[in-house]
Amino acid sequence: MLDLSYSLERVLQEDPAARNKWEVLLLYPGIHALLCYRLAHALHKRRFYFIARALSQLARFITGIEIHPGAKIGRGLFIDHGMGVVIGETTEIGDDVTIYHGVTLGGTGKFKGKRHPTLGNRVVVGAGAKVLGAICVGDDVKIGANAVVLSDLPTGSTAVGSKAKTITKDR
């Protein structure tokens, strides 16, 4: 929970509609979901799996954002207009990532083990995008709205389309 102040600052930097820390803390469901996730994740790491899942489901009911307590999330995640966001159990998210509403970071099978995506630092995932499977998304990647990503994306790339393909790559 030590990154709360950092998360609040990040929202203030990224969202021109955010006026102050109190507004963000009290009225942004993305922050509420992230706070519940941090507690649920701590419980999950201590093998209190049922309590962790119950807390994550309560957060989902309240915020419309589903984050599995087993996911690993770095500092400064900003979930903007988070309704319908799903973050699966083996998902890994780097620092300073932005996720818009309707995004799914999901698995592609029912097998055990790593089955959800890994996102690098400073990734932006547009509204409605689906990033599926045990794939790697590099640092500084932008994923367009409603894109479907099923394979690795290299650092600095931009991906768009229902069968997402790399259209740019920064050098």
UniProtKB/Swiss-Prot annotation:
MF terms (GO), sorted A to Z: serine O-acetyltransferase activity
Principal location: cytoplasm
EC numbers, comma separated: 2.3.1.30
GO cellular component assignments: cytosol
Coiled coil: none
SUPFAM superfamilies hit by this protein: Trimeric LpxA-like enzymes
GO biological process, alphabetically ordered: cysteine biosynthetic process from serine
One Pfam family of this chain: Hexapep
Keyword tags: Acyltransferase, Amino-acid biosynthesis, Cysteine biosynthesis, Cytoplasm, Repeat, Transferase
Family: Belongs to the transferase hexapeptide repeat family.
Name of this protein: Serine acetyltransferase
Originating species: Helicobacter pylori (strain ATCC 700392 / 26695) (Campylobacter pylori)
UniProt lineage: Bacteria, Pseudomonadati, Campylobacterota, Epsilonproteobacteria, Campylobacterales
